[in-house]
Amino acid sequence: MASLNDVCYEKIKNNFYYGLFGDFKLVVDKNTECFNATKLCNSGGKRFRDWTKLEKSKKLMEYYKGRRDDHRGGSNFYEVKGDNKDDEVSKTTGQYVKKELILDIASWISTEFYDKCNQIVIDFFVVEFKEKEKELTHQLSIVEENLKKLRIENENNLEEIKLKDTRIDELIYASKRQEQMLLESHNLLKSMGIEVKDIKEQNNELLNEVGELREDNNELQEQVENVQEQIQKVQVKLEISVEDRAPQPDKRGKKERFILLKRNDEHYPYYTIRAQDINAKKAVKRQQGKYEEVLILLDLVCHPNTKTFYVRIKDDLKKKGVKFNLCEIDISKSVITEKDLIEEMERINEEKRTLIIE
C-alpha cells in the first residue's frame, strides 16, 4: 500500500521531511508515516482545530483511533511541541494525524481539490463498469454458443434413440413371429418325429441379440439424461449472466482507445496513444503536426484498461529485445518485425476473450 513517505522530496531534520500531495506541501514524519495537519490547514488559511470541531471529523478520528491495523504500533494522533520562535524547530511543530485523513482535510481546505478527487473516483468506477460489462457480454456469447451446441447434440441423440426403439420393436415383433412359427414347426416336426434341438439353438441366438440391443438403448438413454443435466446447468449460468448485464453507455468520447502510430522518427519510429476517444484524436493530430509522415498501424477501440494492456505488451516484448521509452518504441535491435509487433499486440488484446466454463 502506498505511503506518504513515497511523496517526500526534501529532508527538514531527523525523521521529518517535506512532501508534495497534489498542490499541497506537507510535513511528513517518516517514522510514523503521519503528516502535520496543523501546517496543512495553515497553508490553506484555515485552522486545524476548526476542522476537529466538525461532526464528520469527530467520527473519522474516532474510527481511525479504534483501528488496530497499523504494523508500526504506537499512536497515529500526536503533537510535536517546541519553540515556534526558532525557525528550525517551528518547521515541524503541530498536530500529526494518519494519512487516511488527508483527503477529508484537503477537501475541507480546497474546493478545487475536492472536485479533482471526485472526478478521479468517477473515472475509476466508469472504467471498472466498462470492463465488467465487456467481460459479461463476452461470457454470455460463449455460454449461448455452448448451449446451442448442446441442444443440437441432444436432438441428434434423441433421433438415434428413436431409430433404435423402432429397430427393437421390429426385432421383438420378428422374435414373437419366429417363436410362433417355431412352435408351429415344432408341432409339425414332432408329429413327424423330427429332432428340433438345432432349431431351438437358433432361436436362443436371436433372443440374445434382442437383449444386447436393449442394453445399447439403456446406455443411450443415460447419455441423453447427462446432456439434459448439462443444459440445465448452462441455462442457470445464462440466466445469471443476463441479470448481471448493464446498459451500454452512448458517449463515444469517453470510450478508451489504444493506438499504435508509425512516424518518421530516427530513434523511435513507433508511438502509442492510450486515452479516451476525444483525447486520443487530439494526440494523433499533435503527432501529425510534429512529423511529416504519421501512419496508424493499429487502433483498438473500447479497450477496457489501456494502462494494464500496455504494461503487458512491454513485459512480453522486452524479452524479444524491443526498446521502450514511455510511449515510444524501437524494434531496430530486436528479433521482431513491424508485422510481428502488430500481431503481438493483437494477440495480447485477444487474450481477454478467453473464458473457462466449469
Curated annotation (Swiss-Prot):
InterPro entries tied to this protein? DUF3627, KilA/APSES_HTH, KilA_N
Q: Which domain of life is it from?
A: Viruses
Q: List each copy of the KilA-N domain by range.
A: 15-124
Entry keyword Coiled coil: yes
- Any idea which UniProt keywords this protein has? Coiled coil
Keyword Coiled coil tagged:
yes
**Coiled coil stretches, renumbered:** 126-245
Family per record = Belongs to the IIV-6 006L/238R/313L/468L family.
The name this protein goes by in its record: Putative KilA-N domain-containing protein 313L
Q: What species is given as this protein's source?
A: Invertebrate iridescent virus 6 (IIV-6)
